């Protein structure tokens, strides 16, 4: 049911140093994007059809990981089945949904997320 990774979220202690490493050393492209929920503009590191969204450990973006410490991350899978199907699967396995369904800005455009 999972076909690929869309993006991961990296919590960084020093955004400038993190951006420098990923862009200057690894050749990724810095990209700014505005989340569909109207929250402030954010930064991401784009490579191929994926991206790494950056969260500043000093000013965590909501929603964020339960314990957003520097070096922690979360990830977003792309699926060939609907969000509604995933809600059913999670309910069957008694897995609570922390956020969603909600529209997010994925690596290649808008997507629905839970």
Q: PLM features: residue spans?
A:
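A generic structural signal for short beta-strands and their flanking turns/coil linkers
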Residues: 6, 26, 41, 48-50, ...
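Short secondary-structure boundary/capping segments
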Residues: 43-44, 64-67, 105
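Vicinal oxygen chelate
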Residues: 87-114
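N-terminal beta-strand motif that seeds the catalytic metal site of vicinal oxygen chelate
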Residues: 1-16, 73-75
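Helix-adjacent hinge/juxtasegments
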Residues: 55, 62-79
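Core segments of cupin and vicinal oxygen chelate
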Residues: 11-58
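Short, conserved charged micro-motifs
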Residues: 17, 82-87
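Short beta-strand micro-motifs in enzyme catalytic cores
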Residues: 41-43, 73, 109-114
């Amino acid at each position: 049911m999972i076909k690929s990774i869309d993006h991961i979220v990296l919590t960084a202690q020093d955004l400038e140093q993190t951006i420098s490493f990923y862009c200057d050393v690894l050749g990724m492209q810095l990209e700014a994007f505005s989340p569909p929920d109207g929250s402030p503009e954010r930064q991401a590191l784009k490579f191929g059809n994926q991206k790494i969204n950056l969260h500043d450990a000093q000013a965590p973006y909501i929603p964020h990981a339960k314990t957003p410490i520097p070096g922690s991350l979360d990830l977003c899978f792309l699926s060939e089945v609907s969000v509604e199907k995933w809600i059913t699967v999670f309910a069957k396995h008694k897995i609570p949904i922390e956020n969603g369904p909600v529209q997010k800005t994925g690596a290649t455009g808008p997507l629905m997320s839970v």
